[in-house]
Amino acid sequence: MMTNPKPWQQGSLIEVEITDLSDRADGVGRWEGRVVFVPDTVTGDRVLVRLVRVKPQYAYGQVQKLLTSSPHRIRPHCIVADKCGGCQWQHIDLAYQQQAKQQVILDALQRIGGFQDPPIAPILSSSSGLNYRNKVTYPLQRSAQGNVQAGYYRKGSHKLVNLNQCPVQDSRLDPFLAQIKQDIQEQGWGIYNEERGTGKLRHL
C-alpha cells in the first residue's frame, strides 16, 4: 500500500516497525529518525499507522492494518479490550508483559532516580495474568435511556464502556457490580453529569 508523499502530518499513513514499549504500554517505533507511539501494538509488530497527533520529533498514531504480527501478541481475554481504557496490556503475552514492566521500572530508576545499577526483584504476577486487581474504581454514568452504567472510559475520552465483569479484577467482585448498578437504578440516586454539573454519585 502506498503512503502519502509528505507523510509527517496529521492524517498521513506510514509503515512502522514496533521496537519497544512505553511506560503506558504504547508501542514505540521510528520513522526517519522520529518517534511514533502506537497504542495496541507490541514489540515485533509491523503496522500501517495513521498519524493522529504530530509534533516535530514525535507523533501518535492509530493502527490501520497489522502487517506483521509479533510473537508476543495474543488475543485479549476481554471482549471490549479494543475500546476500554481500563488496561493496556491484554494483547501482550504474560512473560513479555513482565519483561516490559521490569524495564519500565529500571528505566525510571536510572533516568529519573539517577541510580546506576539498581537491584530490582522480579515482577510478580498471577499465574494467568488475570483476576489480580483487588481494588477498582468505576466511573458512573447514565445511558441515553437513563440506565445506570459503570465501567471504564474509552481510550482517550470520557465516554463510558459499560461493564458487568472485568477479567483482570478479582472475579468475586463481578456479582457486586451488577447488583450495585441495579440498586442505584431502583433507588433513583443522582449520577453526576459532567455536562450539566449535576448529581452526586461519580464513582463506584
Label the model's feature ranges.
Residues 1-204:
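Accessory RNA-recognition modules of RNA-modification enzymes
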